[in-house]
Every structure is written in structure tokens, then in C-alpha cells.
């Protein structure tokens, strides 16, 4: 028979709120299993007869029998005809047991790799699930046409059936890759075809892939100063050394790069709207950086985040579209243009990088959900995306003007608003 303390442990598990959703026999089975793993029940120790334990716990004998049967199937106990149930010999190696004289480990922080320690020390990219007031880069989601999205999703399910629920192409669903290529060619002047598009979950994933596939730990990469913190964190997590390059009213200054052209093998840019200042990289500087990348066989990582929201005139063509040398990787996302919960971003890649990048992403998370990809493809192809972006561009432009006016009026002398040409942030001086 159990010692009274062991019986009380089983009873406590039966009554604990954490386990109330489990069937009664599962609670008994897990309680006894934990006693074995903790070493409270040693190999060869007999278990009480099912009838006796049932009476002690106030449950039916069938319930205890079901618990014992599960423990036997898992290998925790042995059932012997005529001699009852005993703890199996194999549990001698269970994690909770200590050999004679073995020191007891004191709890504490787990030992991490240097890379893991660096990532933990640097913190995550998003720690606030609910955005704080005036937080930059947060899209408005209350105006999204949910009814249209739901209708398109039903169409996808009707056409594809269960195929929309299975594993998909690691490179991304072909209809979405084609829709993305058509869009960036038209709106951003890119050089894109469907077979050069890699669908991802976010721009953050794209930055991480660039860091790990293009460069080795210990190598250096040029970054804007100030830079988007998510990019810097992705590069540092991959073991890269970030070399800051100053930014002025025309964007990143190329002179420090051209003065030391071999100092780094890659450059990360936000040329459309630099984060956080919002300035746009001039055409002259774009061309100079493209030539630098060609001469040094370096890579340009172009993060074209929220380029859809340009409030003054036509935006300059993306760097990737100007680069005839195929040294630029273009990153885009639907996080800000649609909604963050969609979790779809993409890269437009040089042909030689499509295969290695696709393999690398498949090792991370396989692929994006097919249903969301196919629904988004219809949303874009049907003209809904363009219409929605135009409406949101007007809304954000109005809000930007209102905020700038109120800041100037209420905080004049303390803060000078710097109204950017585009984007979802407004810096101040």
C-alpha cells in the first residue's frame, strides 16, 4: 500500500485546478507517473491493488484500472499475474533519480550559447502586444474590409478544397508570387518575376535569412545610423558586426562606404523612408551604392517597408529596380499595408539566390499557410489591395497633417515636427 504521503500527492493532483480538464483516470495516471519520475516510487516498489486504491481515492475500480493500463503501456509499471503491479526496472534511469553521492543540481538560469545570450541581452523586436499611444509604424486595422476578405477566403476553399489545408511550396504559392511580382513591378519599378519571389512570414524573417545565408559570423555589414533596431538585432544575432553609416536629409551618406569599400560585404538600406527619420535616399546616392556593390561584389539588402504610404508626389523607384547587376535583395511586407496578423512578407531575389534562400527558409518554418496566401493573391489580383492602400494613404496623410499641426501648436518651442514624405512615423526635433 502507498505511504500516506504518496496517497496525498495523488489526491492533490486529482483536485488541482490545473488538471481539472483531464479525465479522472488520466489525472491518476499522471500523478503516479510523476511520483515514479521524481524517485518517490523506486523500481520494484509495489503499487496498491486497483480495488484498494479506488477505495482510498473515492473513485471506481475501472478508473484506477484504466490509469494502470496506461502506465503499463508507457512502460512505467509491470503487471504480474498473481503479484499485482510494480514499478518497472527501466525507470531506474528516470530524470528525477540521483545516484549515490550524486550532487543535487541547484536551480537557476539555463546555460545558453553565446549567440543565445546575445539575443536575450538584446531583447526581442516586439515586446508590446498592445501598441502604446503614438507608437510609430502601427497600422490602422479597424477599416480593413473583413467581409471582402471572408468572401475571397470562401472562394479559395470552394475551389481548392482540402488542398488549401495541406503543406505548400516553401517558395510560396505561385498565384501570390505572381501577384506580388506584378504589384512591385508596377508600383515600385522593380525587376520581378514570380520565380524570383520568395514568400515569408515577415521582413524580420527576411533580414535573418539575409544575415545567415549571405554572410558568415564575424563578418561586417554597413547599416544606417540611426538604423531600424530589428535589422540590427537580426544581424547581431547572426554574429555580424554592424558598421554604422550616418544619415542626413538625403538619406544614407555613401562617402564612408566609398572611402572603405572593402570594409563590409553587405549594406542594409531603408531608401524609401529611412527609419526613423523618414528621409528618402536621393537617386544620385542610390546609383553610387549600386556601383559600389557591383565593384566589390557586395550585397544591398533593401528593406522597402511601408513604401505604399507616400504622401508627396511619386516615390522614387526602388533600388532593386535600378540595379542591373543583380546585387540587390528587395524586402517587402503586408504587415503595415494590410494587417500584422496576416504574417506575410516577401523578398525579390537575384536568380542565383532563389534556391539557397528557399532551402534556408524551409529549414526555419517550412512555408506560409496556403489558405492565407491564396486569399491574399485574390485580394491583390481583384484590385482590392490597391483600393485599400489608396484609401489608407489618404487616411494616414490626414492624420499626419493633424498630428503635425497639433504638435506645432501645443508643443511649439519644445518639439519641432519633421513631416516625412511617407511612412507611418513622424520624427521631431
Segments predicted by a language model, with ranges:
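Conserved functional loop/turn residues at catalytic and ligand-binding sites
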Residues: 40, 75, 239, 304, ...
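Domain-scale detector for complete catalytic domains at protein termini or as standalone homologs
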Residues: 48, 235, 257, 328, ...
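N-terminal basic, amphipathic alpha-helical segments
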Residues: 1-156, 352, 358, 362-369, ...
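Active-site PLP attachment segment
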Residues: 322-356, 368-371
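Conserved core of the PLP fold type I
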Residues: 153-297, 308-325, 329, 396
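Short glycine-rich anion-binding loops that position phosphate/pyrophosphate groups of nucleotides
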Residues: 139, 271-275, 336
Amino acid at each position: 500500500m502507498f505511504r500516506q504521503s504518496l496517497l496525498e500527492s495523488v489526491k492533490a493532483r486529482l483536485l488541482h485546478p490545473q488538471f481539472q480538464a483531464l479525465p479522472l483516470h488520466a489525472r491518476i495516471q499522471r500523478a503516479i507517473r510523476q511520483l515514479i519520475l521524481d524517485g518517490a516510487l523506486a523500481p520494484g516498489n509495489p503499487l496498491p491493488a486497483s480495488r484498494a486504491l479506488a477505495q482510498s481515492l473515492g473513485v471506481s475500480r475501472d478508473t484506477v484500472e484504466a490509469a494502470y493500463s496506461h502506465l503499463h503501456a508507457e512502460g512505467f509499471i509491470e503487471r504480474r499475474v498473481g503479484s499485482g503491479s510494480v514499478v518497472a526496472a527501466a525507470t531506474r534511469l528516470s530524470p528525477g533519480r540521483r545516484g549515490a553521492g550524486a550532487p543535487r543540481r541547484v536551480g537557476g538560469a539555463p546555460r545558453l550559447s553565446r549567440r543565445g545570450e546575445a539575443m536575450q541581452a538584446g531583447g526581442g523586436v516586439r515586446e508590446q502586444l498592445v501598441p502604446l499611444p503614438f507608437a510609430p509604424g502601427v497600422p490602422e486595422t479597424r477599416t480593413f474590409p473583413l467581409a471582402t476578405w471572408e468572401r475571397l477566403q470562401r472562394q479559395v476553399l470552394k475551389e481548392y478544397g482540402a488542398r488549401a489545408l495541406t503543406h505548400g511550396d516553401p517558395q510560396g504559392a505561385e498565384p501570390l508570387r505572381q501577384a506580388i511580382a506584378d504589384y512591385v513591378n508596377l508600383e515600385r519599378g522593380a525587376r520581378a518575376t514570380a520565380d524570383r519571389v520568395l514568400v515569408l512570414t515577415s521582413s524580420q524573417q527576411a533580414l535573418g535569412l539575409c544575415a545567415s545565408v549571405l554572410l558568415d559570423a564575424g563578418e561586417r555589414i554597413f547599416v544606417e545610423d540611426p538604423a531600424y533596431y530589428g535589422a540590427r538585432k537580426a544581424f547581431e544575432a547572426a554574429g555580424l558586426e554592424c558598421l554604422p553609416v550616418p544619415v542626413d536629409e538625403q538619406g544614407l551618406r555613401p562617402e564612408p562606404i566609398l572611402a572603405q569599400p572593402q570594409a563590409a560585404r553587405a549594406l542594409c538600406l531603408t531608401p524609401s523612408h529611412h527609419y526613423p527619420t523618414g528621409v528618402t535616399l536621393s537617386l544620385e546616392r542610390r546609383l553610387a551604392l549600386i556601383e559600389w556593390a557591383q565593384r566589390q561584389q557586395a550585397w544591398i539588402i533593401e528593406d522597402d517597408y511601408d513604401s505604399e504610404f507616400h504622401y508627396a508626389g511619386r516615390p522614387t523607384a526602388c533600388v532593386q529596380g535600378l540595379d542591373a547587376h543583380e546585387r540587390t535583395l528587395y524586402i517587402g511586407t503586408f504587415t503595415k499595408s494590410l494587417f500584422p496578423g496576416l504574417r506575410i512578407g516577401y523578398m525579390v531575389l537575384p536568380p542565383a539566390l532563389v534556391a539557397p534562400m528557399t532551402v534556408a527558409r524551409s529549414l526555419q518554418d517550412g512555408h506560409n499557410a496556403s489558405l492565407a496566401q491564396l486569399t491574399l493573391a485574390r485580394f491583390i489580383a481583384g484590385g482590392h489591395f490597391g483600393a485599400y492602400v489608396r484609401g489608407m494613404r489618404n487616411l494616414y496623410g490626414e492624420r499626419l497633417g493633424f498630428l503635425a499641426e497639433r504638435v506645432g501648436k501645443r508643443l511649439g518651442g519644445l518639439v519641432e515636427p519633421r513631416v516625412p514624405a511617407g511612412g507611418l512615423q513622424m520624427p521631431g526635433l
